[in-house]
Amino acid sequence: MCSPIYSNNPPENGYDSKLEKHFISLLSDATVSDINAKLTFVKHGIYLFIQYKEMGYVVNSFPEEVFWNMVNGLYRLIHDCSDKILELFLQVVKKDGFQAIKPFKQTDAHKVQQFEDAMEFIKDIENMRIVHFHNMKTDSITDKDKERKVEKKFQKILNNTIGPKSEAEWEHCITWIYKNCKNIQELLEERIKFLQTEATEEQRKLLCEKYYSCIRVYYNGIMFEIIKEILRKKRESYKDCTRILALVKENEEDIANKAIVLIQNADRRADPYLAALQAADIILTQKKQI
């Protein structure tokens, strides 16, 4: 095997064209940063992907290994609240009487399947990541339902009953990831362009309100780690789980509210994670709990 080539952008000095589909642009820091920076109709910006840091993998490795590294990277990209934000941006808007309270125009009939495929792909990645990585832990409880879903998905991708075995079959699965990631990028670009150039003020307002709701869900999931990080930065004990849980229980709503206010009042792009850290510092300091 030739010297390793790392993802997620093709090297400038060229590469084997057979590896074209091994480079997933959606997994690169540059692409994620670009997407996060494109919505400027509000000063604080809209982060579609939060806390993502690219983890390169060897592109010219064995196809099976490349595939699972892609799955792992995509799971990291969409975990926490990013899947909820993607669900917001990739929703199908139907003429069902509720389209007036949606942040996007009615979805064209010929585009509906693309959006549905994108959301299905996100669920597939979650299932594959859990089945392949989580179920390998000795203390994990095997999720039989997800296992069956993954088996059926592989069968559908390959049109067989045994799943991927050969290198060619794993390459076919990589192509499946590549095409779906390309589809998601195209749909996000379309929705971002609409919000920037065509959306009404009411649609933009609805988008922001739903975005804040997604952020609140995100904060509920990471509040323990937020407070733990503040204690670490203040050089206080951050290994006392009982204390941290007590601080979370007493302060999580106040911290989330403060973080949202900080985001809304920001005169520049505001990273929701950094806003939560700042809010936790302010609230805990005001209450003299740190």
Segments predicted by a language model, with ranges:
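Charged/polar positions within long, soluble alpha-helices
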Residues: 130-141, 175, 182, 186-193
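Alpha-helical rod/repeat scaffolding segments in eukaryotic adaptors/tethers
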Residues: 56, 60-63, 147, 151, ...
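Post-HExxH zinc-binding segment in Zn-dependent metallohydrolases
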Residues: 159-173, 177
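Histidine-centered, metal-coordinating catalytic motifs and their short helical/loop contexts
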Residues: 115-158
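Conserved short strand/loop->alpha-helix "switch" segment adjacent to the catalytic nucleotide/phosphoryl-transfer site
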Residues: 108-116
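Amphipathic alpha-helical interface elements
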Residues: 5-107, 119-120, 179-218, 222, ...
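Acidic, Ser/Thr-rich low-complexity intrinsically disordered segments
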Residues: 216-262
